[in-house]
C-alpha cells in the first residue's frame, strides 16, 4: 500500500510541474511567507502582465477583475508569467505565481 501511495505522490508531483508550463487564461503573482501562507500580490501581477504584453509574450493580456492577469486566448505561459513576477518585477516581493481559485 505504501508503494502505491508513493507512486501516486510522484505522479502528482510531475502533474503539478507540468501544469506550470501549460497555457492559462488567468494567473496571479503571489508572495509566500515564512509560515507557508501565501497571498496574491496585485502590484507584481500588474507589472508581470504589463511586461508580458509589452514584450510580445501575451498580446491580449489585461488586468481583469482588478486582480488577475487575463488572456482570452489562453496565451499566458505559466513559466513565463512566474519569471515575470519574480525576475522582471523583482522589487515587488513576488515569490511565485498561481492559478487563482475559481
UniProtKB/Swiss-Prot annotation:
Q: Where is the signal peptide?
A: 1-21
Protein keywords:
Glycoprotein, Secreted, Signal
Give Gene Ontology CC terms.
extracellular region
The intrachain disulfides are none
Q: Does the keyword Secreted apply?
A: yes
Location in the cell reads:
Secreted
Induction annotation:
Expression is highly up-regulated in invasive hyphae.
What residues bear carbohydrate chains? 36
Role played:
Secreted effector involved in biotrophic colonization of plant cells. Participates in transition from the biotrophic to the necrotrophic phase of Magnaporthe oryzae. Elicits rice basic defense responses during the early stage of interaction and promotes cell death in the late stage of compatible interaction.
In its UniProt entry, what is this protein called? Biotrophy-associated secreted protein 4
Q: Which organism is it from?
A: Pyricularia oryzae (strain 70-15 / ATCC MYA-4617 / FGSC 8958) (Rice blast fungus)
Quote the gene name from the UniProt entry. Answer: BAS4
Amino acid at each position: 500500500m505504501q508503494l502505491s501511495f508513493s507512486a501516486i505522490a510522484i505522479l502528482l508531483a510531475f502533474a503539478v510541474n507540468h501544469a506550470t508550463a501549460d497555457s492559462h487564461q488567468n494567473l496571479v503573482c503571489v508572495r509566500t511567507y515564512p509560515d507557508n501562507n501565501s497571498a496574491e500580490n496585485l502590484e507584481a501581477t500588474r507589472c508581470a502582465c504589463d511586461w508580458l504584453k509589452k514584450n510580445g509574450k501575451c498580446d491580449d493580456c489585461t488586468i481583469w477583475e482588478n486582480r488577475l492577469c487575463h488572456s482570452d486566448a489562453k496565451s499566458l505561459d505559466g513559466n513565463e508569467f512566474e519569471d515575470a513576477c519574480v525576475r522582471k518585477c523583482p522589487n515587488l516581493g513576488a515569490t511565485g505565481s498561481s492559478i487563482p481559485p475559481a
